């Protein structure tokens, strides 16, 4: 510490979540002022020359590790502490600041804070600790008591005697560790309390300390701080009733400013330094503490992993063939090498722990992925059943996972079925103790759009203004306001309209300036998606815990207060329990298949034992790009790539997964050309052929870079991994050193320096975007499994896929389209046949799931199915309502099922069932009341499937088709019985020439797509004409409108900007048949296609304005045929479209044909209703309208 006489001991940071704008650097180097992206606590402290700091966030230690590391980086002494809210029944909750004397004090504070979150939830929100808990955990802690304490409250009420007694009580607890906090920040009541505190200090010998109760860095941050407080409390800045708790003086003052402020109380300044010197917490970072894995008494961890691995290898090789070119001895040699490395590095326990919970999960039938990340390159992992991919056939490297030349924790990422992942976490908690197992915290931040909306609200700006500004911020993941304002490293995400409005409007300037001060501050705490820690001792010996609360105010689902990086810093080992929905889909599909197989006495499918050379899977799924719903291969770009690459072996799938990313994507045309012999495969050196042959001489994987370094440069694989990492970081000095080592190694193999440099440069280029082959291989296996299921069991696979996304209407619509493309019949929801999920009822049939109906919950569906299975099908609406509990089957759910068609079997038609509903509900409610009261005259029938009461229920004609279809769309998210576009389809197609289905759009773009030899990273627009029904309209500010068109065969999003919007905006409304002309292109963001509108027309109006002639072929040989046709035509006169009638008439010589042209007063208006009426008349055999459309004039 420097000789400065003052130290700030009471500072809230952004991690107090509600009342501070002080940022804590995410990385230690950002503590340096020149390296900080924005001013933060440490960078400002360095500028002020502060010797030490204490972070004392409210009820948490979230920031501790980040603060500790950053402070040490810049030579500032870190002091750990926290503000605790203390509650007891007879008093308003009050505050006390605790500082850690040492590591023992940290453990006590950790336990105290954890107890608050687990036991101290308050009904009004937040948490507090009981004074007795502080007394239980006070050792090695210093306490600061100030104006916000209970003593301060009592003094403010005129009870100085009780206030002094309070201080005496806490002095008895903390002894010379108690300090009285004095503040001079311009807030009411400060100076009287200071005088009282000085008086008590003199009487009782309690030291006083000066404090600025810091909440922001500089005075100009006060408004942003107040805005943050208002955001957290739901108030507006100009609300006269909101509490003004803070002042503009609560900034990080310099030592000189504090000295001037407390010139009359120098001891208060000196005591901060003295107390800071007494605080000497030393966090033990970087040492790992593995949980204790139990092994048999006569075994050690090391001997047990050897035994289990060798036994596992024998079991694996009984079922799996040896890798080509490998012997059993090769496997044993590789296994021993890996075991020696694991044991030497002290990670036997880690592997055994992971193997244990994965094996338990598999024994319970929980779907678990074959591997993820570099861990799939370990043979030991394969023998212990951690992974399901033999690494030897695919040349996967152990050193990429665990490098003996670089000591770091191994890190297995494990994919579990989404539905059952928590079962495995519960097993781990039971095995090692719930107090030793926890998930990990994650912090939410104030993102760009959200902070603009929040700031707009607290400023009291009109919603329309704020909403319009928020919508101008691009929908790019991780975008900042700086990016949107065109001030980022590139202008890729700049919004021209946002910039223009910022420059032109004062309100927008105020809004965005304030929002930028708050953007990216930590906002809330949540739970990490998959991270779990297992400790050898109770977790509070390593870090405090945070918890939500249940309805009784008890903490539930505790998580560590340190995030995934910081828990590892304090020595806790993180295990990633990740949820992968694809595993759930595979599991559901396989169970459905095997259920059908069991009925037919066919052997069950074992998805883990599929042959990886199934020709139909490669030919019909991968090579044809038929990969919608196939894991990792479903995007339109990938489907197009597959058609070019035509993969026919598993190694191709691994390569394509790795290549289809920014950077290596440019290599795809060359890869494809070499695969199919269009280009010659060339190797950098003959010795590299075995390394690069599977990728046709192109470096695709990180492992290939490592093997090149080994074979050509003489590196060990461990050193080669260090080289790969260095190449990825591109540090010039490091690269120069490695280049020389590589040259020397290459020279020993007879290679000159020029050739060595050429290969080194090639490796350096590819190392930057080479992919982890172990991860690609493991995920390619999951991809293959889904493709195999789709090819051989499409109904079960698509039913599982649909079920996995039942609550996502857009995805359901797309998957239903794909099911129909596979020639599968999809039956409407039906209470007498459907279950909760989609179900394959036959090899070519899927029954719609009841759970996919909006407004119908899972419990309702399960009750319907359970009752049906016990007592048989439902026979009427009354029968249905009386048999299913009314508490679950409410009117809203019933109406939704009627509109969805699920009750079609229960009445004459949907309109009749809806008409009967009120009377049936009334009757069933009466029956329910009488049953509950013991009067049960209606339930004399022993068979619950047949209600004793009979009602005379009305019937009516069916709804018009449009109403039926709209009801389906409202409840299912799609039109099921048809499509409103159907009546227009024939005429529209004659006009525009194609549907909106994906294959048609692909054909339009096909001529513009790149060939095998052409490299292109952009996708051109193709001018085209399309048509469809407008089903949704979305506006973005005043300058952009997005409409979605559907035609029952497909859908597309169309956008209109500036000039087009000004001219055609009035046509962009729902339920209109719209013809659009514009630029069609691939939409990679939404994985589909989009069209930029340049012109558009209302189809109905176009029919009237541009129909040149109506052609009819009419049979007039029946007596009243002409009268009917003429009567129809008469209703559409006068009009502008002449007619040509090809007539078939009777004559004395038999049937004769003639032609009649009608024009002038006989011309008609072309409307869809006219065409419908004519087509329905039996005398009309042919109808055609000739148009001269405006786009060809």
Swiss-Prot record:
SMART domains: POLIIIAc
GO cellular component annotations of the record: cytoplasm
Catalytic activity: DNA(n) + a 2'-deoxyribonucleoside 5'-triphosphate = DNA(n+1) + diphosphate
Enzyme class: transferase
EC code: 2.7.7.7
InterPro entries for the chain: DNA_pol3_alpha_NTPase_dom (IPR011708), DNA_pol3_alpha_thumb_dom (IPR041931), DNA_pol3_finger (IPR040982), DnaE2/DnaE/PolC (IPR004805), DNAPol_HHH (IPR029460), NA-bd_OB-fold (IPR012340), NA-bd_OB_tRNA (IPR004365), PHP_dom (IPR004013)
Protein name: DNA polymerase III subunit alpha
Species this chain originates from: Xylella fastidiosa (strain 9a5c)
Gene it is expressed from: dnaE
């Amino acid at each position: 510490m420097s000789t400065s006489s003052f130290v700030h001991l009471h500072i809230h940071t952004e991690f107090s979540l509600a009342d501070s704008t002080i940022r804590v650097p995410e990385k230690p180097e950002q503590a340096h002022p020149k390296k900080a992206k924005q001013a933060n606590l440490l960078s400002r402290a360095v500028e002020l020359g502060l010797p030490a700091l204490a972070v004392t966030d409210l009820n948490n230690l979230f920031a501790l590790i980040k603060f500790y590391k950053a402070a040490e980086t810049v030579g500032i002494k870190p002091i750990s502490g926290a503000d605790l809210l203390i509650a007891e029944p007879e008093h308003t909750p009050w505050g006390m600041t605790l500082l850690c004397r040492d590591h023992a004090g940290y453990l006590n504070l950790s336990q105290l804070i954890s107890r608050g979150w687990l036991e101290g939830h308050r009904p009004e929100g937040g948490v507090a600790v009981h004074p007795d808990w502080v007394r239980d955990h006070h050792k090695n802690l210093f306490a600061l008591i100030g104006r916000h304490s209970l003593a301060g409250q009592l003094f403010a009420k005129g009870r100085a005697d009780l206030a002094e007694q309070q201080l005496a009580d806490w002095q008895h607890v903390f002894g010379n560790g108690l300090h009285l906090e004095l503040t001079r920040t311009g807030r009411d009541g400060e100076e009287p309390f200071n005088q009282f505190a000085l008086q008590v200090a003199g009487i009782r010998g309690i030291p006083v300390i000066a404090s600025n109760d810091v909440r922001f860095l500089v005075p100009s941050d006060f408004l942003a701080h107040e805005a943050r407080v208002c955001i957290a409390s739901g108030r507006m800045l100009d609300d006269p009733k909101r509490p003004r708790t803070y002042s503009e003086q609560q900034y990080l003052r310099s030592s000189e400013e504090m000295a001037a402020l407390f010139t009359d109380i120098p001891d208060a300044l000196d005591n901060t330094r003295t107390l800071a010197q007494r605080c000497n917490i030393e966090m033990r970072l970087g040492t790992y503490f593995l949980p204790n894995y139990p092994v048999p008494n006569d075994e050690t961890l090391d001997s047990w992993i050897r035994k289990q691995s060798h036994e596992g290898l024998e079991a694996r090789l009984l079922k799996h063939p040896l890798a080509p070119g490998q012997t059993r001895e090769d496997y044993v040699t590789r296994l021993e090498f890996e075991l020696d490395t694991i044991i030497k590095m002290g990670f036997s326990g880690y592997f055994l722990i992971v193997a244990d919970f994965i094996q338990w999960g598999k024994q319970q039938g929980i779907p678990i992925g074959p591997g993820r990340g570099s861990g799939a390159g370990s043979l030991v992992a394969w023998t212990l059943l951690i992974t399901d991919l033999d690494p030897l056939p695919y040349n996967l490297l152990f050193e990429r996972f665990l490098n003996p030349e670089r000591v770091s924790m191994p890190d297995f990422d494990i994919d579990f079925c989404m539905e059952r992942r928590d079962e495995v976490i519960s097993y781990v908690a039971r095995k090692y103790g719930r107090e030793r197992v926890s998930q990990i915290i994650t912090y939410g931040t104030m993102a760009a759009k959200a902070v603009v909306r929040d700031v707009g609200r607290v400023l009291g700006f009109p919603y329309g203004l704020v909403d319009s500004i928020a919508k101008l911020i691009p929908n790019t993941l991780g975008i900042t306001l700086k990016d949107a304002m065109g001030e980022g490293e590139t202008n890729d995400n700049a919004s021209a309209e946002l910039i223009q409005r910022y420059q032109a409007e004062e309100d927008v300037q105020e809004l965005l300036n304030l929002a930028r001060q708050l953007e990216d501050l930590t906002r809330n705490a949540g739970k990490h998606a998959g991270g779990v820690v297992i400790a050898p001792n109770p977790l509070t010996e390593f870090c405090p815990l945070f918890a939500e609360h249940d309805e009784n105010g008890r903490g539930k689902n505790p998580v560590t207060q340190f995030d995934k990086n910081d828990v590892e810093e304090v020595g806790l080992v993180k295990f990633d329990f990740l949820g992968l929905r694809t595993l759930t889909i595979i599991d559901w599909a396989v169970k459905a298949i095997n259920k059908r197989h069991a009925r037919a006495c066919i052997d069950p499918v074992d998805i883990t034992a599929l042959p990886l050379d199934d020709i139909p899977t490669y030919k019909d799924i991968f090579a044809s790009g038929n990969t919608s719903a196939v894991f990792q291969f479903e995007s339109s770009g990938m489907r197009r790539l597959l058609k070019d690459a035509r993969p026919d072996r598993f190694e191709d799938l691994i390569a394509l997964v790795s290549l289809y990313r920014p950077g290596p994507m440019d290599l795809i045309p060359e890869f494809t050309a070499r695969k199919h012999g269009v280009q010659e495969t060339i190797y950098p050196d003959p010795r590299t052929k075995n390394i690069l042959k599977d990728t046709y001489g192109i470096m695709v994987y990180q492992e290939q870079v490592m093997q090149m370094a080994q074979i050509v440069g003489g590196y060990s694989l461990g050193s080669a991994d260090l080289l790969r990492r260095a190449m990825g970081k591109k540090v010039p000095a490091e690269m120069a050193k490695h280049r020389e080592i590589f040259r020397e190694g290459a020279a020993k193999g007879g290679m000159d320096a020029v050739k060595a440099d050429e290969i080194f440069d090639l490796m350096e280029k590819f190392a930057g975007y080479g992919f982890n082959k172990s991860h690609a291989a493991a995920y390619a296996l999951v991809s293959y499994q889904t493709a195999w299921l789709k090819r051989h069991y499409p109904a079960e696979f698509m039913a599982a896929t649909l079920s996995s996304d039942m609550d996502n209407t857009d995805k359901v619509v797309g998957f239903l389209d794909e099911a129909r493309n596979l020639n599968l019949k999809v039956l409407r929801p039906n209470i007498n046949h459907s279950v909760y999920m989609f179900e394959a009822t036959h090899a070519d049939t899927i029954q719609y799931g009841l759970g996919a109906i909006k407004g119908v919950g899972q419990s309702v569906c399960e009750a319907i199915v359970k009752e049906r299975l016990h007592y048989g099908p439902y026979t009427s609406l009354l029968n249905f309502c009386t048999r299913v509990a009314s508490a679950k089957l409410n009117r809203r759910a019933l109406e939704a099922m009627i509109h969805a068609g699920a009750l079609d079997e229960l009445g004459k038609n949907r309109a009749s069932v809806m008409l009967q509903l009120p009377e049936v509900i009334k009757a069933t409610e009466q029956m329910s009341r009488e049953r509950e009261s013991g009067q049960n005259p209606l339930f004399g029938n022993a068979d619950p499937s047949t209600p004793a009461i009979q009602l005379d229920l009305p019937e009516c004609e069916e709804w018009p088709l449009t109403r039926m279809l709209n009801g389906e769309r409202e409840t299912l998210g799609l039109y099921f019985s048809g499509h409103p576009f159907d009546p227009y389809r024939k005429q529209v197609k004659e006009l525009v020439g194609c549907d909106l289905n994906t294959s048609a759009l692909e054909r339009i773009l096909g001529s513009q797509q790149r060939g095998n030899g052409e490299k292109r990273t952009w996708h051109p627009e193709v001018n085209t004409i399309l048509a469809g029904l407008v089903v949704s309209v979305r506006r973005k500010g005043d300058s952009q409108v997005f409409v979605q068109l559907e035609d029952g065969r497909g859908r597309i999003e169309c956008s209109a900007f500036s000039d087009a919007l000004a001219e055609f905006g009035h046509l962009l409304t729902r339920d209109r048949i719209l013809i659009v002309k514009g630029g069609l292109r691939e939409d990679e963001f939404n994985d589909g296609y989009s069209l930029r509108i340049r012109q558009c027309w209302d189809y109905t109006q176009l029919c009237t304005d541009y129909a040149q002639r109506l052609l009819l072929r009419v049979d007039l040989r029946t007596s009243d045929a002409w009268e009917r046709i003429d009567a129809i035509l008469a209703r559409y006169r006068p009009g502008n479209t002449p007619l040509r009638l090809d007539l078939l008439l009777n004559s004395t010589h038999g049937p004769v044909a003639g032609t009649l042209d009608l024009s002038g007063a006989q011309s008609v208006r072309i409307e869809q209703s006219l065409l419908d009426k004519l087509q329905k008349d039996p005398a009309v055999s042919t109808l055609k309208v000739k148009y001269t459309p405006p786009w060809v004039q």
